[in-house]
Amino acid sequence: MSLNIGLDLCDDYISGYLHEDKLLLSAPAVVCREKKDDLWYIGEEAYRLALSGKGVLTDKLLSLLKKGGTSTVMRKAYTAKQLISRLIAAMLWQLTNGASADSIDRLVIALRSAEKSE
């Protein structure tokens, strides 16, 4: 199986398109780590977990990356690159229903500037 995937990432959302299935998914560009276990969530699930008090949410990931910043979650510092990697991996998993990374033939990622336009 050969998959072609496009991702669009900005501070507010991540969208993914799987060409073969004409599948488009979009989610808020946030990650949340569950307090009890080392489980991570993205998008609306992440917001629900954080609002219930059961998770720690991080947002504005591209801005964090641009500043070279880190986010401390459950007493552990994560780089913006690590958090964005979690976000992208989770979106790819959702798009491909957990298919192996070897099945991805092409992956194109468009990043929107973290700066606000005037």
Question: Positions of the model-derived regions?
Answer:
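Short glycine-aspartate micro-motif
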Residues: 2-9, 108
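Conserved phosphate-binding loops in N-terminal lobes of ATP-dependent enzymes
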Residues: 13-110, 115-117
